[in-house]
A protein has these predicted regions:
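Lipid interaction determinants
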Residues: 17-153
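Sec-dependent bacterial lipoprotein signal peptides
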Residues: 1-17
């Protein structure tokens, strides 16, 4: 019986050695078009943002947010939709420390309102959390974030 347990242990060791604590960045980011869910303030980034407060709560505001989209492409570029135009940028993320860099952000029109908030959130994004269903981007201080998801329009 002990021999059987030892055999199972030795067979499982390669699986344990192959584990990686880092995120699969492409699985998370390149999982389709993301819609803006809301902007949040407060909360504790290290504790699943307990106590974070949504900036927008009215149904019309949420619909307007969901119209804003961002698509992370495997070639390191971004394509997005604002209320009055589109935007592009470059992105890179590190799955080990969950940092993100968004650079060379260009818009086809001057962003205003919620579009401006999204553009500013992307410019200031330094950290991310999430999976292929939801994504949170936070600035360096981690005191606010934008949440993205795959929401129906």
């Amino acid at each position: 019986m002990k021999l059987k347990h030892l055999l199972y242990l030795f067979l499982a060791l390669p699986l344990l050695w192959g584990c990686n604590n880092g995120d699969d960045v492409n699985e998370i980011f390149v999982s389709g078009t993301w819609n803006v869910g809301n902007f949040y303030n407060g909360g504790d980034w290290n504790k699943l943002n307990d106590g974070a407060r949504a900036k927008y709560t009215k149904e019309d505001d949420i619909k307007a947010l969901n119209y804003l989209t961002i698509t992370f492409l495997t070639d390191g570029t971004i394509q997005g939709r604002m209320n009055n135009g589109t935007f592009t940028a470059n992105w890179s993320a590190n799955g080990d420390d969950r940092t993100i860099s968004i650079t060379q952000l260009k818009t086809t029109a001057t962003p205003s309102g919620k579009s401006k908030e999204l553009i500013e959130a992307l410019k200031n994004a330094a950290y991310y959390k999430g999976d292929s269903n939801y994504l949170k981007l936070a600035p360096q201080d981690k005191k606010s974030y934008v949440q993205l998801g795959h929401y129906p329009e």
